[in-house]
């Protein structure tokens, strides 16, 4: 058994486990996500075998007391072939770190990964109540930690987000557009978005992380600052995703990318 450990945010945990799961499937090794054994209880994986608090506690303290080894995947572009040999040979071990990457295997087992992270029925039912006809645009506004992420490069103002949304609207002049705005800014100026996007219906779902991700996954297009949250939301249905790398850049349909490309180009 390979116990996958991480302390990051939900979407990062999903991607990290996806890589280890895919490697395990390819090499007939069972894997278990320590994170989803007790946290972010929105997904099918949380109800599968081994994903429970007892398994989490066992792995945590067995590693802490040195009873099972821990492999750290912390260095980008490092050669982890020795680690892979240990993952093949050792009966029990813990793996941790963000730099585990098996892109081809992830894509090979992507359908299974999506099924593991299928949203619970209650989450889907909540989302269904918010969905309306028309072209659904999901917008993820990232603030908070983005003040320091890459030196604040992707910390955009409301004016910049609205400008990008307007560019999207101009690409679809004959469509009725629903704009679903999610994010981590509790002080977001909602009235500003409603006033500036008066030709669209603007919805602020106020969901938890699982509900927000589920809602975004049911949109037709996604827009946001580069983030694993929108990336994973796009994974479920191969949605076109526009990462705002330069808010002044003219928007075109060609600038939208899908998960299979973007997950290999994470910031």
Place the predicted regions along the sequence by residue.
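Short hydrophobic beta-strand segments
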Residues: 1-6, 30-33, 93-94, 132-145, ...
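Short, solvent-exposed turn/loop segments enriched in Gly/Ser/Thr/Pro and often Arg
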Residues: 34-41, 183-184
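Short amphipathic alpha-helix
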Residues: 16-23
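A short, glycine/small-residue-rich beta-strand->loop->alpha-helix junction that serves as a flexible
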Residues: 5-15
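Gly/Pro- and small hydrophobic-enriched strand-loop and loop-to-helix capping segments
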Residues: 25-34, 236-267
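Donor-binding and catalytic core of enzymes assembling or modifying cell-surface/extracellular glycoconjugates
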Residues: 10, 170-245, 251-252
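Secretory-pathway luminal glycosyltransferase catalytic domains
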Residues: 39-176, 259-261, 267
């Amino acid at each position: 058994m390979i116990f996958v450990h991480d302390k990051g945010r939900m979407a990062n945990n999903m991607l990290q486990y996806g890589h280890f799961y895919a490697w395990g499937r390819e090499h007939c090794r069972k894997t278990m996500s320590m994170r989803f054994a007790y946290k972010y209880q929105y997904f099918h994986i949380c109800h599968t075998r081994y994903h429970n608090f007892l398994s989490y506690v066992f792995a945590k303290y067995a590693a802490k007391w040195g009873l099972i080894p821990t492999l750290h995947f912390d260095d980008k572009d490092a050669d982890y072939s020795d680690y892979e040999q240990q993952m093949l040979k050792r009966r029990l071990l813990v793996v941790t770190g963000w730099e585990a990457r098996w892109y081809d295997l992830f894509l090979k087992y992507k359908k299974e990964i999506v099924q593991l992270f299928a949203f619970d029925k209650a989450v889907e039912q909540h989302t269904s109540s918010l969905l309306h006809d028309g072209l659904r645009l999901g917008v993820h506004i990232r603030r908070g930690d983005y003040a320091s992420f890459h030196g604040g490069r992707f910390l955009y103002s409301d004016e910049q987000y609205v400008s990008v949304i307007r560019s999207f609207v101009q690409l679809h002049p004959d469509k009725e557009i629903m704009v679903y705005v999610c994010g981590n800014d509790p002080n977001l100026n909602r009235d500003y978005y409603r006033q500036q996007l008066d030709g669209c219906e603007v919805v602020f779902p106020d969901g938890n992380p699982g509900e927000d991700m589920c809602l975004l996954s049911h949109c037709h297009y996604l827009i946001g600052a580069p983030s694993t949250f929108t990336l994973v939301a796009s994974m479920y249905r191969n949605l076109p995703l526009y990462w705002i790398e330069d808010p002044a850049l003219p928007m075109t349909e060609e600038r939208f990318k899908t998960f299979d490309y973007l997950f290999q180009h994470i910031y």
